[in-house]
């Protein structure tokens, strides 16, 4: 499966869209907002460019990316005022895979510009926003054109499903699982780690050419607390997806062979792995590396399991539909998913 041609968050603004089911991602970015804004302030103090180049890598199609830009503009406005500098122009590049619903982002731009002009006597800052489709696992931008790179909830997605998961006959060595689980052989976690190393190293190398000397990056991604790949965090939610798909197999909606060959292109690194890989690649230095845990929450009248199921559906629907075809009932699949999450949570209470 060609991830770059298939993978995308569910577009539009419907009930199952990413725009309606990305509150978890918004909460994560809000939790580290102070770090992002401090980084922007430090950057402007040290460089104070007349034209500030900003890239949001993995912007997706929800409202989160434009809210980030608004926050950045406000911090730069305040900082430039303190320094008695004229406000720079802002060059904003919104990047995601070509399959992303960029139109939803573009349709929200008039409201974004209108909000920025409110309470500003001079009509607002000069902001030039462009969509930049393509994989960030490789070069995207000209040399030395960016000052700040931001990526939230994207770098845990690999460029592809690790090829080493399959034997010489093309059969998965991780049958019945969509990710690393307790029943996975050691070669599975090694395959995922090797793919993450390859991808993350290429990401860092590519960005090092595109960002100016003294530029900054803030990267937010899912990770794991310890060295064990199987925990009650990310691997747990993929385990629930494996079990939900197994129910679809038992109901005759999909073939067992299809389930056995489905693997997610995902990896949750530990902080040690990130730090080691940044040091090994050598282009950047880690200034700050922290782990945050997000509290469970759900919308009013909705169970936690349902909230998680809707989030997973919004990020996995494109891949599931492409792999399993039209025969799979997504509503039933994710209803089962939500129920199982609630059952597991009840056992912990």
Swiss-Prot record:
Enzyme Commission code(s) on record: 2.1.1.-
Entry-linked InterPro entries: MeTrfase_7, MeTrfase_capping, SAM-dependent_MTases_sf
Enzyme class: transferase
Pfam families: Methyltransf_7 (PF03492)
Swiss-Prot/TrEMBL site (Involved in substrate discrimination) positions: 150, 222
Cofactor details (free text): Binds 1 Mg(2+) ion per subunit.
Biological processes, Gene Ontology terms: methylation
Cofactor(s) this protein cannot do without: Mg(2+)
Binding sites annotated in the UniProt record for S-adenosyl-L-homocysteine: 18, 59, 64, 96-97, 135-136
UniProt-recorded Gene Ontology molecular function terms: metal ion binding; S-adenosylmethionine-dependent methyltransferase activity
Signal peptide: none
Keyword Metal-binding tagged: yes
Binding residues annotated for Mg(2+), in chain numbering: 174, 260, 262
SUPFAM superfamilies reported for this sequence: S-adenosyl-L-methionine-dependent methyltransferases
UniProt entry keywords in alphabetical sequence: Magnesium, Metal-binding, Methyltransferase, Transferase
Family from the record: Belongs to the methyltransferase superfamily. Type-7 methyltransferase family.
Protein name: Probable methyltransferase TCM_000336
Organism the protein comes from: Theobroma cacao (Cacao)
């Amino acid at each position: 499966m060609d991830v770059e041609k298939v993978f995308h968050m569910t577009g539009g603004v419907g009930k199952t869209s990413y725009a309606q089911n990305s509150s978890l991602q918004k909460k994560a970015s809000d939790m580290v907002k102070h770090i992002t804004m401090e980084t922007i302030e430090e950057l402007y103090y040290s460089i104070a460019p007349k034209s500030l180049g900003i890239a949001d890598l993995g912007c997706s199609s929800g409202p989160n990316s434009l809210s980030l830009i608004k926050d950045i503009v406000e911090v730069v406005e305040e900082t430039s005022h303190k320094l008695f500098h004229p406000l720079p122009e802002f060059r904003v590049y919104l990047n995601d895979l070509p399959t992303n619903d960029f139109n939803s982002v573009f349709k929200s731009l008039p409201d974004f510009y209108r909000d920025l002009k409110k309470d500003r006597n001079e009509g607002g800052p000069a902001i030039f926003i462009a969509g930049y489709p393509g994989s960030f696992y490789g070069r995207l931008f000209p040399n030395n054109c960016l000052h700040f790179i931001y990526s939230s909830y994207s770098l845990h997605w690999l460029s592809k499903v690790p090829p080493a998961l399959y034997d010489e006959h093309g059969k998965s060595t991780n049958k019945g699982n969509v990710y690393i689980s307790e029943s996975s052989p050691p070669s599975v976690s090694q395959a995922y780690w090797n793919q993450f190393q390859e991808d993350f190293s290429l990401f860092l190398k590519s960005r090092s050419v595109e960002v100016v000397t003294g530029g900054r990056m803030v990267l937010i991604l899912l990770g794991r607390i310890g060295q064990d790949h199987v925990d009650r965090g990310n691997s747990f939610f993929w385990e629930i997806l494996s079990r939900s798909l197994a129910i679809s197999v038992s109901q005759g909606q999909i073939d067992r062979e299809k389930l056995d060959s489905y693997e997610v292109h995902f990896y949750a690194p530990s902080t040690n792995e990130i730090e080691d890989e940044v040091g090994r690649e050598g282009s950047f230095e880690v200034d700050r590396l922290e782990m945050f845990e997000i509290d469970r929450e759900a919308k009013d009248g909705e169970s936690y399991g349902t909230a998680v199921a809707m989030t997973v559906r919004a990020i996995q629907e494109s891949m599931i539909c492409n792999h399993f075809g039209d025969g799979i009932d997504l509503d039933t699949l994710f209803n089962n998913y939500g129920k199982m999450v609630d059952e597991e949570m009840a056992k912990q209470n």
